[in-house]
Amino acid sequence: MISITSIQQLRLHLAEEKRKNHSVGFVPTMGALHRGHISLIKQAKAENTVCVASIFVNPLQFNNPEDFNKYPIQRESDMKLMSEAGCDILFMPDVAEFYPTRPNMKIDIGLLDQILEGAHRPGHFSGVAIVVSKLFHIIEPGKAYFGQKDIQQVAVIRQLVSELNFPIEIIACPIIREESGLAMSSRNMRLSAQGKAVAANIYKALSVIEKQIKQDKVTVSDAQHAGKNYLNQFKEIEVEYLEIVAADTLEAITEYADQTKIAVCIAAYVEGVRLIDNLVIIL
């Protein structure tokens, strides 16, 4: 694996790979890697000649400065994990290289910026869209890989690719979970052992809702209440939102008519750490 910090150097290196007709798969990350990230690297390497990954903590997508300052940085261990997983090129620019001046532009995502994560993290998806657009322009991959845990981010990026005609296939990879069911996340590092045990109930609540819908055939409203009632047992969990939505648009639904695939999406705080998760349900 080679590590590159310069945009110009990366472009020169990738130009040579493409001259050889090598396919390029890309995995963007912010570091603090876990098994979820590693699964993306392995899939990208399996499906492409060259696997490129990036580590860049993007300041534009943090609407809470404290959250940005607390984001875990562990460059040496991240580089080791990347190399062992099969990454060929690791791009690690600093902020001055990536944003010589802070961008003045914002990207209006439309409806996706007004619901779920968009409603609770103003400006977040504009920041995501800018950093991903820049990375796509710099790297020009054939495929890019993202985790399904960030289901709304995947939807935003698919919209970005479609509307701006990026010739890139977006691959959404399955959520990787701990044995307890807790979705793998870099933020989990900030939880105590007890906090992790409590946070596992977030996924259990999603499973309760799935059972209510698929086995007990309850209404959308009743299924949602069942999930909230389950979480109400745990005073350590503060739910920000728990929504049942159409899986394609992520718009909230009130009934199952005409729906073939729905998603249950949640954001909650445990020990002051904001966690998100989702469960897609085939009807």
Curated annotation (Swiss-Prot):
One cellular component (GO) term of this entry: cytosol
Binding positions (ATP): 30-37, 147-150, 176, 184-187
Annotated GO MF terms: ATP binding; pantoate-beta-alanine ligase activity
One Gene Ontology biological process: pantothenate biosynthetic process
Its EC number(s): 6.3.2.1
Record-linked NCBIfam families: cyt_tran_rel, panC
Name of the protein in its database record: Pantothenate synthetase
Gene this chain is encoded by: panC
